[in-house]
Amino acid sequence: MKISVKLIKELRIKTGSGYLECKRALQKSNGNIINAINYLRIVGTDIAQRKVLRKTKFGRIFSYCSKNLGVLLELTSETDFVSKNEEFKNFGEKIVNFSGNNKIFDLTEINEIFNSKKINFISRVRENIEINKIKYITGNIIESYQHLGKIGVIISGKMLSPNTHLNTTKCFKNIAMHVAAAAPLYLSELDIPNNVLQKETDIQKSIAKKTGKSSKILQAIIKGRLKKFISEITLINQNFIINPKITIHDYLKENQVWINNFIRLQVGENIDNLNT
């Protein structure tokens, strides 16, 4: 039977599917909108199931912030083109807001809740979409920073003296920007797991022994290199990117504030910040 453009348009509005897909569905359903929708759902689910194993290396980071809660979510796709799609952005915002509003942070649970919507989305864009990572943070002061949708940072902290709100906000925003750029793994030396420090110590011992120096000098070399290692991976010991002459610790002290915790997500990054 001949399918009118008006009917195809109506089905497209209802399902978000392409023109030719809607036309084919209506032809298969003899022009019945309800049957056409069901047909698209069946075909779309089949297409989606074939695509879910494809790798997703592009995507965006989404954030949710309330007075004392922050959530970061990584939603990934196969291509950069889809990750810039408005529907992709809306889907990511919907998920992260749901997580924050309902205080659900378990990735498996979030995937189960949004699975049917994700499958429908995959069938429309014809490529795999993954709800890849989710992190959350709590605290009295929450500040966030997003860099081009590819890196997201949220920090929690506290005032050590009655600073003005404007100064505090600016201070924490600067630190969030620093975390985005410098990618610290831990807040302080106390947060570094013993096995990480031990592994680095063993590596530096092996390197130092090759110098043929005396035991006393070797100990000094190892100690110096470990100190450098710690300063590179801990937030408060890093040189402040905005003013490299001081450390983050110096900046915090100067502004009479402190960082309790932070989370950072970057699209496609496999190294987890163990601060969560």
UniProtKB/Swiss-Prot annotation:
The keyword Cytoplasm applies. It comes from Buchnera aphidicola subsp. Cinara cedri (strain Cc). Keywords: Cytoplasm, Elongation factor, Protein biosynthesis. It holds the Pfam family EF_TS. Residues 79-82 are annotated as: Involved in Mg(2+) ion dislocation from EF-Tu. HAMAP family: EF_Ts. Associates with the EF-Tu.GDP complex and induces the exchange of GDP to GTP. It remains bound to the aminoacyl-tRNA.EF-Tu.GTP complex up to the GTP hydrolysis stage on the ribosome. It is found in: Cytoplasm. This is Elongation factor Ts. Belongs to the EF-Ts family. Disulfide bonds: none annotated. CDD domains: UBA_EF-Ts (cd14275). One of its GO terms (molecular function) is translation elongation factor activity. One of its GO terms (cellular component) is cytoplasm.
